[in-house]
């Protein structure tokens, strides 16, 4: 499983001009699911995400978590995080989870994040989404379950 975590001042997801999720200060998280991922792996990733200290404290040191700053989450599914570009110029996505399995784990991530953080917003799995955000920093972290 891969999360691309971006600290944002605000972010929103729209589909066909309709806003499906919008947050102010918080994290925009792109979620990629591999075929080998499980709920146990998702639990480890979510625990790391929720407890990651990437917001500045009063001394401007990254020492505060999303809950410490009353921040929000917007979770966006993105199978392209598992693009393999080793051969040729067209990415392969064979390492990405099948749509049914990936959607199940994406929904699980949303459900578990809602238990841990107030103000969780979302995109729509498999939809053609437009993501608009303002990075804060920028501060971006790629979290890969293979490296936890």
Predicted segment positions?
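Residue-level signal for inorganic ion chemistry
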Residues: 45, 76, 139
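Short glycine-enriched loops at secondary-structure junctions
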Residues: 9, 73, 78-81
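Compact, glycine-rich, soluble single-domain proteins
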Residues: 19-70, 83-111, 115, 121
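Short beta-strand segments
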Residues: 6, 32, 77, 132, ...
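Short, low-complexity, polybasic intrinsically disordered segments
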Residues: 94-96, 136-148
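Divalent-metal-activated hydrolytic enzyme cores
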Residues: 115-129, 134
